[in-house]
Regions:
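Bacterial N-terminal signal peptides that target proteins for export
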Residues: 2-15
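Beta-strand cores of secreted/periplasmic/IMS beta-sandwich domains, seen most often
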Residues: 50-74, 103-115, 137
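Short Gly/aromatic-enriched secondary-structure transition segments
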Residues: 74-80
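Extracellular/periplasmic metallocenter environments
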Residues: 46, 95-138
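Short beta-strand and strand-turn-strand segments in soluble, beta-rich domains
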Residues: 83-91
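Bacterial signal peptide processing site
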Residues: 29-31
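C-terminal motif of bacterial Sec signal peptides marking the signal peptidase cleavage site
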Residues: 23-27
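N-terminal edge beta-strand
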Residues: 34-58
Length: 138
């Protein structure tokens, strides 16, 4: 009886170790990258961001138009000027944000480099309504 108990205890111990090992290995698998949230304020002829450097990966831009005019939000490589730009397999399009309104746009930016957010409402970009930020390697 004592030998039976010892064998059974060994089996239970081995099963427990196996379960713990499998669980530990599963936890070591690749994790989805965290979404970086960036607060962006649009006002007459200015765009300000709460971050100027973000890691590559998914980004959620939360735009708040505190101005009295409608503004656009366009994401593009720094130095571009309203040129077609593909991101996430789709063209980065302008999002119009009415005065006093907010909008959320999500993109995955995998390529490190310098980017800009710009407003191309007629005359706004020319008055300095753009800002640049850096995407760093994860």
């Amino acid at each position: 009886m004592n030998a039976h108990f010892t064998t059974r205890a060994h089996r239970l111990s081995l099963i427990l170790l196996l379960v713990i090992g499998v669980t530990a290995l599963a936890a070591c698998g690749p994790k989805a990258p965290a979404v970086t949230e960036v607060q962006v304020t649009l006002n007459e002829y200015t765009i300000t961001m709460d971050k100027t450097s973000i890691p590559a990966g998914p980004v959620k831009f939360v735009f708040n138009n505190t101005g009295s005019l409608t503004h656009e939000a366009v994401l593009e490589p720094a130095g571009a000027h309203d040129e077609p730009f593909s991101l996430d397999g789709k063209e980065s399009e302008a999002e119009e944000i009415e005065a006093g309104q907010s909008a959320t746009l999500e993109w995955t930016i995998d390529t490190p480099g310098d980017y800009q957010l710009a407003c191309y409402t007629p005359g706004h970009f020319e008055q300095g309504m753009f800002t640049t930020f850096t995407v760093t390697a994860p």
